[in-house]
């Protein structure tokens, strides 16, 4: 029970941070090694100023991806171009970037704007320029236009980023996703707030506020619901809340521990930790009927379940080997297999959406860091270098991990790419932030 007490204390501690309009993202490592790309300011074809600079959103997204490094606009060979027709391939011959994004915005009626953009392959354009005159469309990677309102500028900027990212990497972009997290501010009577925001911290919304701890938010596969643990009734209970209707459903309120909910891939069940029959064990609860099926049965602590992408197995943390390690249980046979062996502890694990890697918290020499293990080679890579990392959650495209850590004595969120190159911190002005969860594709 000593280990469980530590985990529960950590989880309660994890629930304490302040609400703010947006989380600030401070990039701490990895930009210099990223792939150069050019993003031109979108040409404004109206009076006054545009509602928002879409190119700024795109540049910020590409930087935060850890994959791309937008070049300084002042060093680009052309200015004020908004379409492929204005692009001069010969002028870009010595620009060390693989692509350029150009676009335009013009009024299109009352609170309506026509946004157009072109993604141009600079490598192909430079090669064609050496061969002589050719059709510019040969190096056009994508071209789109859409009518949006002023309120949609930021979201459409994320959409452009998704398109650019996928065209250049072959991986779906995750810039139109959201995150949930718990903010704790003990200067307020209701100190705990369950928040959701865009992946970059903008458009923050409060889902629930409570004087008692809130923890462990988890997204449904369709992005419509959140499961979480609340102590509002002076005991741990698991709720599922619809983000659109705000309807809350109490799913689990058994005696003892009700914790660590995570949705099944089909959204019909929750894997949870319950202690109603004695020791903390893994159960699967049918959300519609509330029926709980016991999955593990061991005298040691079993907790922190997460699903394999095929829905046929669960990954969980157990100290059945003497120390917390990650195990896999087959839901049909009940067979349990140990998955981790390196380091002192390994806990809080999840499988990446492609099923190829495991992301988890590794403790080695007393330091808690986020780590990744390749499931085919079993090679483990420690991704972070701080000391008190916890609660990793993987982006739906598998390229980034958001997690909780400590910075200057406060709980903050941080992000790291799954190759460990790119690192960023997401601090807030007051209070602390913890228990992050990254949404599916929306």
Swiss-Prot record:
<dbReference type="GO" id="GO:0051301">
    <property type="term" value="P:cell division"/>
</dbReference>
<dbReference type="GO" id="GO:0017038">
    <property type="term" value="P:protein import"/>
</dbReference>
<dbReference type="Pfam" id="PF07676">
    <property type="entry name" value="PD40"/>
</dbReference>
<dbReference type="InterPro" id="IPR014167">
    <property type="entry name" value="Tol-Pal_TolB"/>
</dbReference>
<comment type="subunit">
    <text>The Tol-Pal system is composed of five core proteins: the inner membrane proteins TolA, TolQ and TolR, the periplasmic protein TolB and the outer membrane protein Pal. They form a network linking the inner and outer membranes and the peptidoglycan layer.</text>
</comment>
<dbReference type="Pfam" id="PF04052">
    <property type="entry name" value="TolB_N"/>
</dbReference>
<keyword id="KW-0131">Cell cycle</keyword>
<comment type="similarity">
    <text>Belongs to the TolB family.</text>
</comment>
<protein>
    <recommendedName>
        <fullName>Tol-Pal system protein TolB</fullName>
    </recommendedName>
</protein>
<keyword id="KW-0732">Signal</keyword>
<dbReference type="InterPro" id="IPR007195">
    <property type="entry name" value="TolB_N"/>
</dbReference>
<dbReference type="GO" id="GO:0042597">
    <property type="term" value="C:periplasmic space"/>
</dbReference>
<dbReference type="InterPro" id="IPR011042">
    <property type="entry name" value="6-blade_b-propeller_TolB-like"/>
</dbReference>
<keyword id="KW-0132">Cell division</keyword>
<dbReference type="InterPro" id="IPR011659">
    <property type="entry name" value="PD40"/>
</dbReference>
<feature type="signal peptide">
    <location>
        <begin position="1"/>
        <end position="21"/>
    </location>
</feature>
<keyword id="KW-0574">Periplasm</keyword>
<comment type="function">
    <text>Part of the Tol-Pal system, which plays a role in outer membrane invagination during cell division and is important for maintaining outer membrane integrity.</text>
</comment>
